């Protein structure tokens, strides 16, 4: 179909703001759009008359505005076309974006002069009589003073950085000009909701992320920014920040100014909100107000990113429901958006940005968006995507990546020289810039550094010497994340990931679960009572990574409640809450929700790294009853369940409550089912340097069917502790100090399971000398009384016997 001569080609998006003269010499419309298949969607748009005489006007007599958003040679092109021709066209293709731009165009293009259609929000003026925090008075996330440039350490160019700066990024500062170069890139903002006239602005970066349940587009500039949030379960909403000198106008009705939420705000920019207005629910209105509040509270990066983590934590602690998910998703994404706006704004105001903030910003974007897509809006985590344009020029981003690569290569040669904090900096940088996914052996180097840190922290955890502080938790998260970030088809990547999962399960002991739940409760109180700055990784636990699914079983809750007296913050909170036990139950529920939501779904993790379990299992039984999965070797895994249904070597665990049965199945292709026998034995001592128990797992369970711990024996040092018995310095291996009676099994990598008799025969009770003396004295008194009593009985018997004899003689007479 040829393009009629009366059709006017309006302009390319990048040229629109430059006011170029339109031309009418165009090729065939179909060839221009690159359309070969007939689309299933036909535009049926009625005549739309306009009265504007200006040739550059958006509305002309008997013409229709058309924006091509699909992937084609005409992508990003605006057209004016005669309405009569538009009515006959079938070329319009649904865009790849999930933001429903095509539906918006078709459904709301011909709204005429009616302003109250469902994509325009006439919010009442929003005013608050509260004190707004100063832009430069951000919350400090630690006890250290904020580092500032000095005369001897001024802001510099990226090319002057050295690899050592990667492990100490807090005291290096980058010139703002490194973000944009000599000239700031000017582009046109084309509204994804097709409601606003394109706006020219100085562009810094674009971020697009989402899943099958939602999509978010963020566009960040110096004096302009926008976020568009679209969900499968809710209408889209858009927030725009613009400098006061710029007018935002609607496409329909023609060039009508769009009113900001509050013209009288004290901020240097105006706030615009587009979203459903008519018949909006209370949740919708509440989310709008919260989005606006997040803009007006502060322009400080530290404040906004702390609020982002706080809201993400609250989201994780909130019971799952469509209403809660929609509201919380909007709140968290808006806070993340505002942290990016604040970072750019502060950098251009001060003329510099810290190297640490550049890296933390990229890491936060990845971690927060991926975490959201793990549990929000019933999304499939496998559909998560992130398209993040750096706020650095490409060549400058390459400089940073080159520094990180050099640091990683050097660190992989001598990981012992790195402290926990330095491990955190290196692994966070690798995670933020996707170094694990690069070609060559960089992924292997990152995995090596990560695994060495995990092994070191595992050793401390088993020996009860680990300090679960902020640095350790954050570093451990990035260590696991960097390993799983590596493509699983790379050499040794899957084996390393399976081993990492074993270490995670080994650190996720019963005591650690209880301690973590109490830490989460304390954070919830800090956020809701004190509004303290937090980071979601402050409560990270290996249990989030481990393939252990019994976190929410009731016995963990009981143990946590009994330990509340050791946590004054929780105890004081409960004392001031009139609900009593209900308040304590609520805190426990929130703690369990946080751990459960932050975990990667079981089937996704198994599909990637333990596919033999998925192949040999009934998916419903696996998801419903699996307590633990241990990928103990490169080919086989142990699965602990409450029901039968997994194909492999099946072990029926004896000595547990019949109502809480345990089954252990060793799974390996080709999924042949046989019955296994758990053999009781005394572990023989290995000779010389042999390590027959390396790679085994010590699994301990109680008589009521609860799993206590699964300790991975990863080295000869741990093997020596295991066979030391009562002389072992590790309490998990020492039968004389093992808490709570139970049974210990040793799981071998080849599928063999034995019961360790040492934990059943050596139950020694430690008794104080005072108790022994008291018991001895008491026993002596009891024996004396018994002797006296027996003698009295004997004497009484003799007396009665003699009387009987006398009576007998008397009768004979």
From Swiss-Prot:
Residues 137-147 have a biased composition (Basic and acidic residues). Residues 212-273 are annotated as: Interaction with gL. Pfam families: Herpes_glycoH_C, Herpes_glycop_H. Residues 135-159 are annotated as: Disordered. It is a single-pass type I membrane protein. It comes from the Viruses. Residues 19-769 are virion surface. GO terms for biological process: fusion of virus membrane with host plasma membrane; symbiont entry into host cell. Keywords: Fusion of virus membrane with host cell membrane, Fusion of virus membrane with host membrane, Glycoprotein, Host cell membrane, Host endosome, Host membrane, Membrane, Sialic acid, Signal, Transmembrane, Transmembrane helix, Viral envelope protein, Viral penetration into host cytoplasm, Virion, Virus entry into host cell. It is found in: Virion membrane; Host cell membrane; Host endosome membrane. Interacts with glycoprotein L (gL); this interaction is necessary for the correct processing and cell surface expression of gH. The heterodimer gH/gL seems to interact with gB trimers during fusion. This is Envelope glycoprotein H. The gene is gH.
């Amino acid at each position: 179909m040829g393009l009629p001569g009366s059709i006017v080609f309006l302009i390319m998006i990048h040229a629109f703001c430059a006011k170029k003269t339109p031309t009418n010499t165009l090729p065939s419309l179909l060839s221009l759009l690159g359309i070969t298949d007939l689309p299933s969607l036909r535009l049926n748009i009625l005549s739309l008359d306009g009265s504007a005489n200006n040739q550059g006007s958006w509305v002309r007599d008997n013409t229709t505005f058309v924006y091509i958003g699909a992937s084609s040679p005409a992508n990003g092109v605006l057209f004016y076309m005669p309405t009569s021709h538009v009515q006959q066209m079938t070329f319009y293709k649904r865009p790849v974006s999930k933001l429903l731009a095509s539906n918006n165009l078709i459904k709301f293009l011909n709204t005429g002069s009616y302003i109250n259609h469902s994509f325009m929000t006439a919010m009442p003026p929003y005013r608050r009589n509260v004190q707004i925090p100063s832009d430069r008075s951000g919350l400090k996330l630690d006890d250290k003073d904020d580092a500032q440039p000095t005369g001897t350490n001024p802001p510099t160019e990226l090319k002057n950085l050295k690899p050592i700066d990667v492990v100490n990024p807090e005291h290096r500062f980058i010139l703002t000009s490194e973000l944009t170069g000599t000239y700031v890139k000017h582009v046109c903002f084309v509204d994804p909701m097709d409601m606003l006239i394109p706006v020219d602005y100085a562009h810094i970066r674009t971020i697009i992320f989402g899943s099958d349940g939602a999509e978010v587009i963020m566009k960040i500039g110096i004096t302009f920014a926008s976020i568009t949030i679209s969900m499968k379960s809710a209408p889209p909403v858009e927030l725009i920040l613009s400098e006061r000198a710029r007018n935002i106008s609607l496409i329909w009705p023609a060039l009508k100014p769009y009113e900001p939420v509050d013209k009288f705000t004290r901020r240097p920019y105006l706030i615009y909100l587009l979203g459903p207005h008519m018949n909006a629910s209370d949740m919708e209105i509440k989310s709008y107000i919260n989005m606006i509040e997040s803009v007006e509270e502060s322009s400080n990066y530290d404040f906004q990113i702390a609020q982002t983590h706080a809201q993400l934590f609250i989201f994780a602690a909130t019971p799952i429901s469509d209403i809660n998910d929609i509201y919380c998703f909007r709140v968290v994404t808006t806070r993340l958006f505002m942290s990016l706006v604040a970072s750019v704004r502060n950098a251009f105001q001060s003329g510099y940005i810290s190297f640490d903030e550049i890296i933390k910003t990229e890491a936060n974007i990845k971690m927060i968006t991926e975490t959201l897509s793990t549990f929000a809006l019933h999304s499939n985590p496998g559909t998560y995507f992130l398209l993040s344009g750096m706020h650095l020029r490409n060549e400058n981003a390459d400089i940073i990546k080159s520094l990180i690569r050099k640091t990683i290569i050097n660190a992989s040669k001598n990981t012992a020289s790195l402290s926990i904090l330095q491990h955190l900096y290196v692994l966070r940088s690798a995670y933020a810039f996707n170094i694990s996914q690069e070609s060559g052996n960089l992924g292997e180097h990152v995995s090596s550094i990560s695994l060495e840190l995990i092994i070191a922290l595992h050793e401390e955890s088993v020996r009860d010497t680990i300090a679960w502080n902020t640095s350790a938790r954050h570093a451990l998260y990035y260590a696991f994340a960097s390993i799983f970030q590596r493509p699983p088809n790379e050499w040794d990547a899957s084996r390393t990931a399976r081993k990492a999962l074993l270490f995670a399960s080994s650190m996720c002991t019963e005591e650690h679960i209880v301690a973590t739940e109490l830490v989460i409760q304390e954070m919830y109180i800090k956020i809701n009572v004190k509004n303290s700055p937090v980071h979601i990784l402050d409560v990270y636990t290996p249990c989030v990574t481990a393939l252990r699914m019994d976190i929410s079983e009731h016995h963990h809750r009981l143990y946590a409640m009994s330990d509340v007296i050791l946590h004054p913050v929780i105890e004081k909170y409960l004392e001031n809450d009139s609900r009593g036990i209900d308040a304590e139950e609520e805190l426990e529920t929130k703690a369990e929700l946080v751990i459960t939501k932050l975990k990667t779904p079981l089937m996704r993790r198994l599909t990637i790294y333990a596919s033999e379990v998925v192949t040999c299992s009934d998916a419903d039984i696996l998801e419903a009853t699996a307590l633990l999965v241990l990928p103990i070797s490169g080919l086989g895994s142990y699965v602990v369940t409450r029901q039968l249904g997994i194909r492999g070597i099946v072990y029926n665990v004896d000595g547990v409550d019949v109502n809480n049965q345990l089954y252990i199945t060793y799974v390996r292709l080709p999924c042949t089912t046989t019955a296994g026998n758990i053999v009781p034995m005394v572990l023989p001592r290995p000779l010389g340097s042999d390590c027959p128990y390396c790679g085994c797992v010590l699994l301990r369970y109680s008589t009521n069917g609860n799993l206590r711990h699964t300790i991975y024996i990863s080295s000869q040092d741990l093997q020596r502790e295991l066979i030391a018995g009562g002389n072992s310095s590790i309490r998990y291996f020492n039968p004389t100090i093992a808490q709570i009676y139970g049974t210990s099994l040793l799981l071998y990598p080849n599928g063999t399971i034995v019961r360790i008799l040492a934990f059943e025969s050596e139950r020694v009770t430690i008794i104080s000398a005072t108790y022994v003396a008291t018991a001895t004295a008491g026993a002596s008194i009891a024996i004396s009384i018994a002797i006296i009593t027996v003698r009295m009985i004997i004497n009484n018997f003799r007396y009665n016997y003699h009387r009987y004899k006398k009576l007998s003689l008397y009768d004979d007479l």
